[in-house]
């Protein structure tokens, strides 16, 4: 599935966090790794220094992969001139890239912030391929021999959220790791107008209000729980038929991102796979909502599947 993996780098230490993750994936899938740097036009005089750096990095990657994979992988270096957003998108579209792995934050603006006007945001909702985002601190937190040991797949019951399912299945099958399906059952709560809102529509509530809501609505409607369970069992059966080890979890809450982050901690998840289209579309899942919050406050690598990639 991942024949070509693109690693956009800005030559900062933060951006190099992707190297061990990409090495492990490439070793398992036999992928070609492409190290990609976009330089400013005015830095032509020192391009040879950029190339030297990337060549040393490529050699390190090859040596690391030899330790875990029976066959070596190809590591290619590309340097372009221009802006990262445009150059990365052009490379993806013209070179049959299957996956992008990049740091969620670096020294030159590859970052998710309060507003998503960044390279990462542009790439995530523009390119027609999955994008894996790694937080720099994550590499410092894990002491595991393998970086990918399990996978968390949040679903919201919508057709769009299930776009992540085929990718999750391919990743789990290729890495031979189990999948945990996850669904949050919405706790309804009164709005300022007296009507009731659903937690999946995601609004900010303060801690005191959240405690009141959860105490007043501590139990999920039995029929709703049965419906959710039936949905997850259907997906679980499909994955098991394809040789994937799979289980499921259901929690109740009002903040989907918070529940995803918590369950990833409880299960010590190594990868979260999500579609960038949720119940309310791209703007709801990516632009200032669930996926952004999971990335910003969570520590687990996030694999985002744009609807165009499905």
Q: Language-model segments: which ranges?
A:
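Intrinsically disordered or low-complexity boundary/linker segments at protein termini
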Residues: 1-17, 72-73, 99, 104, ...
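Short, well-ordered secondary-structure micro-motifs
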Residues: 45-46, 113, 144, 191-195, ...
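Short, structured motif recognition centered on aromatic/hydrophobic residues
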Residues: 7-8, 21, 25, 33-35, ...
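Protein-protein interaction modules outside structured cores
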Residues: 258-262, 277-285, 293-302, 306-310
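Structural beta-alpha unit
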Residues: 67-100, 105, 234-272, 309-310
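Glycine-rich, Arg-bearing micro-motifs that act as flexible, cationic patches
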Residues: 103-125, 146, 271-296
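Acidic, proline/glycine-rich short linear motifs
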Residues: 24, 36-60, 184-230
């Amino acid at each position: 599935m991942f024949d070509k993996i693109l690693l956009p780098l800005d030559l900062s230490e933060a951006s190099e966090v992707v190297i061990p993750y990409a090495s492990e994936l490439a070793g398992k899938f036999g992928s070609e790794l492409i190290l990609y740097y976009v330089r400013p036009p005015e830095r032509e005089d020192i391009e040879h220094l950029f190339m030297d750096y990337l060549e040393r990095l490529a050699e390190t990657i090859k040596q690391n992969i030899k330790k875990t994979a029976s066959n070596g992988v190809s590591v290619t270096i590309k340097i372009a001139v221009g802006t990262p957003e445009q150059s990365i998108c052009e490379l993806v579209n013209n070179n049959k890239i299957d996956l992008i792995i990049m740091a969620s934050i670096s020294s030159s603006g590859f970052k998710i912030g309060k507003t998503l006007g960044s390279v990462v945001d542009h790439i995530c909702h523009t390119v027609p391929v999955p994008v894996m985002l790694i937080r720099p601190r994550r590499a410092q937190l894990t002491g595991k021999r393998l970086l990918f040991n399990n996978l968390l797949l949040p679903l919201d019951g919508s057709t769009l959220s299930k776009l992540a399912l085929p990718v999750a299945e391919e990743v789990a099958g290729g890495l031979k790791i189990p999948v945990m399906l996850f669904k949050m059952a919405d706790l309804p709560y009164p709005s300022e107008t007296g009507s009731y809102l659903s937690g999946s529509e995601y609004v900010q509530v303060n801690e005191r209000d959240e405690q009141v809501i959860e105490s007043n609505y501590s139990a999920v409607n039995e029929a709703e729980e049965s419906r959710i369970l039936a949905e997850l069992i259907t997906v679980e059966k499909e994955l098991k038929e394809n040789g994937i080890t799979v289980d499921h979890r259901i929690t109740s809450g009002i903040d989907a991102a918070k529940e995803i982050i918590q369950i990833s901690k409880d299960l010590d998840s190594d990868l979260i796979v999500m579609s960038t289209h949720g119940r309310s579309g791209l703007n709801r899942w990516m632009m200032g909502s669930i996926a952004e919050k999971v990335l910003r406050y969570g520590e687990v690598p996030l694999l985002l599947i744009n609807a165009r990639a499905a």
